[in-house]
């Protein structure tokens, strides 16, 4: 009975982590991301510092991020991959900032073998490091995971483009969501925010 209870407890923890990762991860503001990034740089955990930059700027899931080698990203203008979850082919443009950051971190990390995987931690360990780091810098959000980076990047693009519906639809396509309702929940767009759109009709014709 003890073995069964322990096994059940393990399953519960695994399911809880999966729920946080896939459904309800909190997004982080750019200020919170900067604080978290500085925390890992101070600890000289450059793998985690780069993960924050990479995940935020590419909107990729950890299952895809964890497959990249240095050779596949350094001095590249595009990333080519088949998404592990969806099986869909993706072409992701590497912006000038990310391109420069990859070179910078490669040097800081003492030029690893080009065939080395960049992000070597397991998903579980990575999530624990993110959660511990967040607490260490005073971020009080409880549902932080690798998925928070993807969600934060998507939310940032949406807000930077004045919550444009055109940009929203493009972000939804990038995220490969089944429908726009999923994307609205994902970006944390509330019913109140949707209702506020109608305030634009407060004009006299």
What annotation goes with each model-predicted range?
Residues 1-27, 202-205:
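C-terminal secondary-structure termini that scaffold catalytic or DNA-interacting sites
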Residues 40-43, 128-169, 173:
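Short, basic (Lys/Arg/His-rich) helix/loop patches that form interaction surfaces
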Residues 73-75, 164-187:
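Short, polar N-cap/turn motifs at the start of nucleic acid-interacting alpha helices
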Residues 24, 93-97, 164, 188-205:
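DNA/chromatin major-groove-contacting recognition/catalytic segments
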Residues 84-103, 112-132:
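C-terminal catalytic core of Y-nucleophile DNA break-rejoin enzymes
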Residues 86, 175-200:
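Catalytic-site neighborhood detector that most strongly recognizes the C-terminal catalytic loop/helix
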Residues 2, 8-10, 67-99:
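Conserved tyrosine-mediated DNA breakage-rejoining catalytic core shared by Y-recombinases
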């Amino acid at each position: 009975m003890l073995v069964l209870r322990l096994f059940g407890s393990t399953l519960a923890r695994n399911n809880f982590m999966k729920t946080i990762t896939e459904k309800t991860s909190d997004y982080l503001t750019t200020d919170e991301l900067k604080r978290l990034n500085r925390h890992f740089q101070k600890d000289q955990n450059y793998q985690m510092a780069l993960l924050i930059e990479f995940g935020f700027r590419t909107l990729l899931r950890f299952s895809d991020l964890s497959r990249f080698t240095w050779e596949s990203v350094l001095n590249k203008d595009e990333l080519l991959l088949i998404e592990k979850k969806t099986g869909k082919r993706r072409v992701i443009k590497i912006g000038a900032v990310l391109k420069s950051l990859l070179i910078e971190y490669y040097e800081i990390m003492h030029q690893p073998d080009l065939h080395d995987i960049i992000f070597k931690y397991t998903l579980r360990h990575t999530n624990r490091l993110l959660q511990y780091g967040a607490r260490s810098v005073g971020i009080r959000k409880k549902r932080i995971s690798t998925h928070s980076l993807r969600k934060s990047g998507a939310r940032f693009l949406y807000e930077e483009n004045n919550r444009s519906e055109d940009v929203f639809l493009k972000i939804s396509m990038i995220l490969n969501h089944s429908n726009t309702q999923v994307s609205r929940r994902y970006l944390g767009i509330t019913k109140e925010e949707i209702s506020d759109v109608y305030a634009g009709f407060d004009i006299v014709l």
